[in-house]
Each structure stands twice: as structure tokens, then as C-alpha cells.
Amino acid sequence: ELHLFGGGNQALEIEDYVRTHDKGVFYHGSLPKERMREELTRYHASIIPLTVRIRGAVPSKLFDLLPLGVPILFCGGGEGEEIVKENQLGLVSAPGDYERLSKNIRAMSHLPDEEYRQLKANCLRLSQTTFCFERQLEAYKRFLSAF
């Protein structure tokens, strides 16, 4: 199954497609952030698309997923791709490379349990260390106090 959440300019097209094709795809629309966090923990992975690369930008969805321990299927390049690869948080495909994304979805669904558990653990570890909001805020305060 593939469960899609969110809005945006293609929401109506997605709704129409899902309604007219019985392919195990479900579109849920937009949910409030807290409900979304709760919902995401029910799934094995989450797709993070980044169609337009912005130098220095990392999709905020990455930071939302890490503390939930949800492995990532990243579709994009740049810093987001590097973070996912270097920290073994999931699998990566180029923007628009639907063939690779499809292969990554299949690969993720067939990972041995130990490898899958390690991806989840890597997500949780990174959320508590490098990308811990409180730690980043303290580092920022120390940086500002130096001036």
C-alpha cells in the first residue's frame, strides 16, 4: 500500500487518479501536524520529495521524521541527499527518477529486519544528537554570546 498525505497544486489530480485506479494507493489530504506525527508512526517509511534544489536548504519533513524513527525515501539532491546517505537514514533517488524511487520502495519493503531496525535507530540517534533542536538552540546561543 501507498498512503499519500498533504495538499498542494496537484492534490486534485492525485485524488482523481486514486479514485479511478484501484492500485493500493490511498490519498488522505492534509492533516494537522500533531495528527500527522501520530499517523506517520504507522508506516514503514516516508517519501520526502525535493524537486527544486535550493543550496543549503534541507526539507523540514526530514527533521519531522527523524524523532519518529521513520526511515526515509529521499527524492532529491543536495544537503538532504547527503544527510540521508551519510547517516544511513534510508534510500535516495534523483528528482523525477520514478524508476529508481520504485526500486527503492521495493528494496525498503524487502529489507531484512535487522537492517530496517538499524535505519530506524539511525533516525532516532540523529534526532537526539546532530539534529536535536534543543542542542542546536544552545549552540546558537553560545555563538551569539561570543559577539
Spans of features found by a protein language model:
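Acidic donor-binding loop of glycosyltransferase active sites
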Residues: 40-55, 70
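Short loop/turn segments at beta->alpha junctions
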Residues: 31-32, 58, 69, 76, ...
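Nucleotide-activated donor-binding/catalytic signature segment of Leloir-type glycosyltransferases, i.e.
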Residues: 3-6, 11-37
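Short alpha-helical segment that forms part of, or immediately flanks, the ligand-binding pocket
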Residues: 37-41, 59-68, 81-82
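A charged, aromatic-enriched C-terminal amphipathic alpha-helix characteristic of glycosyltransferases
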Residues: 96, 100, 113-144
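Short glycine-rich donor-binding/catalytic loop of glycosyltransferases
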Residues: 51-52, 70, 74-81, 95-96
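Short hydrophobic beta-strand element within catalytic cores of glycosyltransferases
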Residues: 46-48, 64-75, 91
